[in-house]
From Swiss-Prot:
Native source species: Buchnera aphidicola subsp. Acyrthosiphon pisum (strain APS)
Transmembrane segments: 15-35, 53-73, 136-156
Top-level taxonomy: Bacteria, Pseudomonadati, Pseudomonadota, Gammaproteobacteria, Enterobacterales
Primary subcellular site in the record, as a coarse category: membrane
Protein's UniProt name: UPF0114 protein in repA1-repA2 intergenic region
Domain of life: Bacteria
């Protein structure tokens, strides 16, 4: 009976597969949105102000950061929780694949969230004259919360690794 339970629990990891497939669809949609923004600004690029162009570029950077986060979560999550990817050509295998444990994934996700939040905050500051001070303050507080959380998670990870080495 115990063997059946253990095999069932182990096999249940495949229930995460549709989640990673769904994330890949999200990545496709994000890529479409990226190119939609590029096509959308092309007719106005000559007349666009420098700050307007910077805002558009910040939006593109934001999409790229979220896309990178999605790829990292999909690949490392699949390899950590479902199965190792069997890529035949070792030259095409990404260098970080198979090397990230759950804690390093959490730290990468946290630092990506801080980077994404930074881009949003920069975009907000560039349009500060149109935005209420309360909203700007709230966004700064949220960003600082992300930063402190990322530092806290990295510190905890460092301490747990140090404790693991000592034992």
């Amino acid at each position: 009976m115990e063997k059946i339970i253990e095999k069932s629990i182990y096999a249940s990891r495949w229930l995460m597969f549709p989640v990673y497939v769904g994330l890949s669809f999200g990545f496709i949609l994000l890529t479409l949105k990226f190119f939609q923004q590029i096509v959308f600004i092309m007719p106005d690029i000559v007349a666009m102000s420098e700050s307007g162009l910077v805002l558009v570029v910040l939006s593109l950077i934001d999409i790229a950061l979220v896309g990178g986060l999605l790829v990292m979560v999909m690949f490392s999550g699949y390899e950590n929780f479902i199965s190792k990817m069997d890529i035949q050509d070792n030259q095409k295998r990404l260098g970080w694949m198979g090397t990230m444990d759950v804690n390093s994934i959490k730290n990468k996700v946290a630092s990506s969230i801080v980077a994404i939040s930074s881009v949003h905050l920069l975009r907000l500051f560039m349009e500060a004259e149109k935005i209420l001070d309360d909203k700007i303050m709230l966004c700064v507080i949220i960003h600082l919360t992300f930063v402190l959380s990322a530092f806290g998670m990295a510190y905890i990870d460092k301490m747990s690794k140090k404790k693991h080495i000592l034992h």
